[in-house]
Amino acid sequence: IYTDPDTSSGWMSSTPSNRLYERLKAYPITDLAPVFDRGVRGRTMSGPKNLWLLNKVHDTGIRTVIDLRTHDHTDRFEQNVRNAGMDYLSVPIDKRHTDVHDIIAGLPGLFEILDRGDFYISCAMGLHRTDIALAIYYVFHPTVAYENVPEMRGHRVDGHFRCEDIAARLNSIIKAITPEELKMLELPEPYDTEFAHRKKKLFEVNRQF
């Protein structure tokens, strides 16, 4: 979590404890990372060899697994998640190929679980689509405090933040979103000014990590 009471003097950061991350980091979960103080993210644990890991995830207190995969989504993974005692939510998200209105339609369910906590949000590569999902959550869900900027971990080259793919998806949503979709997300119309402020904040803070 980042706060900047005086942006002229630089960024001030604080990292809240995350009990789920602390419990899970002992296990071989690829790209495991905390999400705020109430969830974790990482690579999709599909395949028979990961069944034991899904059980460990459940045992630490995870209630819902969020799957961001698109064409590589499988019913078998959903069944494995449910057999391990957790709820499963598929919200296909990527940087450009998924229809933007399909993404918007899935946001209320995604936001509800991210607000509630006790989730594991995953994609095939662990960090790239989870970056995009968390960026959408921050920019299009103003109940998230303005200073609670999520860290973009998957879009870095030689330590430098690359925002192009994230910006492209955020921009595609604000350009396509309809008045009905704004109402569904409980966003004011127009939303352009708040969108611009939050996108700028997201990118500025992530350049400081």
Predicted regions and their residues:
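Cys-dependent protein tyrosine phosphatase-like superfamily
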Residues: 1-120, 132-209
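Conserved lysine of the Walker
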Residues: 129
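Conserved G/P- and acidic residue-centered "switch" motifs that form tight phosphate/ATP-binding loops
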Residues: 126
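Short cysteine clusters
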Residues: 123
